[in-house]
């Protein structure tokens, strides 16, 4: 074979091998970096732009797509120990003509974390209101979506600032009082009684604990590679002391039943979405809300756990779009493609 041809194949093979080897090395040595790159790439692909806004010396980090228009803007509040990017799987299936805003909740990701901050549910509600005011998002009433802890905050926000919100989607929200405790809550109470707050199931510190948390929060049993589990843990470990402080605050007497105590004040059209197999917050919470919120509708998803947004993103997006169409434009029966 001609020497030039051999050289060409060697160069081509080397060119292909370098990025492949770099990827493999990154996967094995720095899985957390790959996870960050993954979110960056997904945001870019979906057209979500990251911005910062300040209220005095407090910084909020958020991502957005689109501009305010004749349709209500949509503000999305994530759950405990998550971040704004958890909504990307749903954003993928939402129409491009909606103005979407996903904010990092107080102390999370790019939003200020202060030891002086009030992390109670009401404290978080007031912070989110500051964010809304900074963006002037309430120049026209907007649609508010929250899941888990974010659902608790969203519901209380709608009760505290009714003129800001035109409609509401609560996805397996926390903050309700049940007649009986499920197994997860019983376990939390046992930990509380034994003062073993270092072993909160939602705050993993090893790949094994991360795997257990994923199984707790999901009905679908994902087969997650060990390196990805390690990467997920590596991303969280620097923040675990904050997560522990936040968790103890939101399950304290001050915040534990915040949504329950305010649900009768919610007057806007409300959509309640819940996974039937939720092991963290029992699906019976949907009926509790529906009985108290007059203008509400319930959507229970079969074969779905607590992580509704991650397990059923397409269905969640469809339910939200159809709900918005029915509430704000009854003549429009637009369906998702």
From Swiss-Prot:
Keywords: Endosome, Hydrolase, Lipid metabolism, Lysosome, Membrane, Mitochondrion, Signal-anchor, Transmembrane, Transmembrane helix. The lineage of its organism: Eukaryota, Metazoa, Chordata, Craniata, Vertebrata. Lipase that preferentially hydrolysis medium-chain saturated monoacylglycerols including 2-arachidonoylglycerol. Through 2-arachidonoylglycerol degradation may regulate endocannabinoid signaling pathways. Also has a lysophosphatidyl lipase activity with a preference for lysophosphatidylglycerol among other lysophospholipids. Also able to degrade bis(monoacylglycero)phosphate (BMP) and constitutes the major enzyme for BMP catabolism. GO terms for molecular function: monoacylglycerol lipase activity; phospholipase activity. Residues 30-337 are cytoplasmic. This is Monoacylglycerol lipase ABHD6. One of its GO terms (biological process) is regulation of retrograde trans-synaptic signaling by endocanabinoid. It is found in: Late endosome membrane; Lysosome membrane; Mitochondrion membrane. The active site is at residues 148, 278, 306.
